[in-house]
Structure formats: C-alpha cells, structure tokens
Design a protein with these regions (language model features):
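Loop/turn-rich, solvent-exposed surfaces of beta-rich toroidal or solenoidal domains
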Residues: 175-176, 180-184, 193, 197-233
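Short loop/turn segments immediately following the C-termini of beta-strands
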Residues: 29, 69-71, 117-119, 172, ...
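A short beta-strand motif characteristic of beta-propeller blades
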Residues: 2-7, 42-48, 90-96, 143-149, ...
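A short loop-to-beta-strand structural motif that recurs across blades of beta-propeller domains
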Residues: 33-35, 81-84, 132-135, 176-178, ...
C-alpha cells in the first residue's frame, strides 16, 4: 500500500468526489470553497461557495451538489444553509430551508439524500443538541421531503447499501454505523435503525460503498479507514499518517482501484494505492 499527498494547504477538507475527467473535487469548510485537484499535477481549481461547504456529490446530470452547512463550524463566513449546485464554475442554490446539511448522496430512487446535523454540536452536553434529520430531494424542483426527523445527534455520513435496501448513516458521537430500511417517510422502520457496527477508538464521518458492498468509513480521531462488510464485521483497517484527521473518502482512479481521502488536520488530499499482496486487505475485496 502506498499513500501520497496530492495537494495540501487546502484548509479543512471534506467531501472528495472522483470526476469523469479524472480529477477530484473536494470541499474546504474553512476556505468556503471547492477545490478541484488533478492527480497528474495540473493546476488546482478553486470555486467559491461561501459559508461552510461540507459534503459533495456528482449528479447524473454532471452537476456538483454541495451540502452547505451555513458556516456553523470552522467556516470563514456564513451563508444560507441548504444544497448548492455548481455548474460550469457558477454556484447557485438547489434547495434551502434546512438546518445544517452535512453530507449527501444520490439514492436508488434518483433523489438526492441529505443528512442534516441542524446545529453546531455541544460536545460537553450533547443531549442538548437537536436530533439529526435526513432529507430526500427530487431533481425536478419539487419540495424536499424530510424522511427522518428523530435521527442520532451529530448525524454525519451516508450511503446506500449495495442492494439498495438500506440507508447507512454514521452517528459520530456514539461511534456507530446505523442502517435504516428504505421505505416511505411514515414507515415505522425509520424510527428503529439497525446497529451495523460500533467503531473502536474513533469517530465515524464520511463513507463510500465499494462495488463488493463494503462500507469504507473515515474515522477522524483515529487517523484510519475501517472497512465494514455487509454483515457488520470489520474486515480491514487502513492506517493513515498520524494527525491526518480523515473526514471522508471516495473511490477513483482509471480502474476504480484507488482511494482518495480528505485529511482535514493536514489540510490535504491523500491518495491510497493498493497491491494484491497487501496484508491488511487479505480479507477484503479491493475497491476495484
């Protein structure tokens, strides 16, 4: 396994996305912008969003969708909370009326699903913080639907399982990976998530699902990526440089066999390359 720093001095990085032109887009909460990094060493592009851009997703229309938290955490300024879109370098709003969007992903129903932390978390008294929300936003301009109203405090990353039957979310304060059975908004299954995994020594943040159905989860305080199989077992751990503070992860590369990690404390974007003989991955399928 080899880990390279592709770019640094990017601020508090989040939300990496592999683009069709083989560059990586990511957000910088502290710089109030998106950066687009060329792994081949080309110039870094900067797109100003204002506020605190958090998660990032690429739509089927080629548009970048930004979870704009409004600047509640570590941002250089404020902005209306909601979902922004980036088209040809221009930023506009796709949805507003949210609390503090954190991360987002496109679902099997073609809607954009968004975790909403709602407010800055009081770590000394987390019980005073509001429960997390999940929104589902149609792309046709219809109003977003609030699917989950009583989620975990500090709801964070999200992804759909490979069989599209469950929505996975990370509950950062409880170090848990939870699964909600996909159903209508009024279904009782949204009130009873299934505990998939409890993480050791680290707070789960963003994640990505590999083609084999494994969840690759960034653990901020632990400087590692844990790979969780569909049964809820940890099948591998990827140790990152000390002090990285990984916030999110995506799969990319020409053969979809590389991992890209936003390392917020070192203000950088990391690339992880694997080989078939990596001892740490013997029980897991590699990303590609």
């Amino acid at each position: 396994m080899r880990i390279d720093v592709l770019a640094d001095n990017l601020g508090f990085t989040e939300g990496p996305v592999w683009l069709p032109d083989r560059r990586i887009a990511l957000t910088s909460i502290s710089h109030g912008c998106l950066y687009v990094v060329d792994p081949a060493g080309g110039p870094v592009e900067r797109i100003v969003t204002g506020g605190g851009p958090n998660g990032l997703a690429l739509g089927p229309d080629g548009v970048l969708y930004v979870a704009q938290n409004g600047g509640i955490f570590g941002a250089s300024g404020s902005a209306p909370a909601g979902v922004q879109i980036v088209v040809d370098g221009h930023v506009d709003y796709f949805a507003t009326g949210m609390g503090a969007p954190n991360d987002l992903v496109f679902g099997p129903d073609a809607r954009l699903w968004v975790t909403d932390t709602r407010a800055e978390i009081d770590y000394a008294a987390p019980e005073a913080s509001p429960p997390g929300w999940v929104w589902a936003c149609p792309l046709d301009g219809a109003e977003p639907e609030r699917i989950l109203e009583d989620g975990p405090v500090f709801i964070n990353g999200l992804a759909f399982t490979g069989d599209a039957r469950s929505l996975l979310v990370t509950a950062t304060l409880s170090s848990a990976l939870l699964a909600y059975e996909v159903a209508s908004a009024d279904s009782p299954t949204w009130a009873r998530p299934r505990l998939v995994h409890t993480f050791d020594n680290g707070w789960p943040d963003g994640m990505v699902i590999s083609p084999s159905g494994q969840a690759w989860v960034a653990l901020t305080a632990a400087d590692r990526i844990d790979v969780i199989d569909p049964a809820g077992d940890r099948c591998a751990t990827i140790e990152l440089p000390a002090g990285s503070l990984p916030t999110n992860v995506c799969i990319g590369g020409a053969h979809s066999d590389e991992l890209y990690v936003t390392a917020a404390h070192t203000q950088s974007l990391l690339r992880v390359r694997f080989s078939d003989g990596d001892a740490s991955m013997t029980e897991c399928a590699l990303p590609g």
